[in-house]
């Protein structure tokens, strides 16, 4: 026994009647803004990482200080 197209249609109609089209569209807009800000945050995190120094450079710096 699987879910048919009529059962899905009835559920969609009930959701639209309960929440209204305006509420659903504003909710989807908020979800889209959240996804965009998440992607933007992930992109800036990747580009903000400093380049690692070579180990030999770190050893030379410590030897010069001694």
Curated annotation (Swiss-Prot):
Any Pfam family: TatA_B_E
Origin superkingdom: Bacteria
Principal location: membrane
Key word Membrane present: yes
Sequence intervals crossing the membrane: 1-21
Keywords per UniProt: Cell inner membrane, Cell membrane, Membrane, Protein transport, Translocation, Transmembrane, Transmembrane helix, Transport
UniProt similarity note: Belongs to the TatA/E family.
Protein name as annotated: Sec-independent protein translocase protein TatA
Source organism of this protein record: Pelagibacter ubique (strain HTCC1062)
């Amino acid at each position: 026994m699987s879910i048919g197209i009529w059962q899905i249609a009835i559920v969609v109609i009930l959701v639209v009647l309960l929440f209204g089209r305006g509420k659903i569209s504003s909710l989807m807009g908020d979800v889209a803004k959240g996804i965009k800000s998440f992607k933007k945050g992930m992109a800036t995190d990747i580009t903000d990482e400093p380049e690692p120094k070579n180990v030999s450079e770190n050893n030379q710096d410590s030897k010069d200080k001694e």
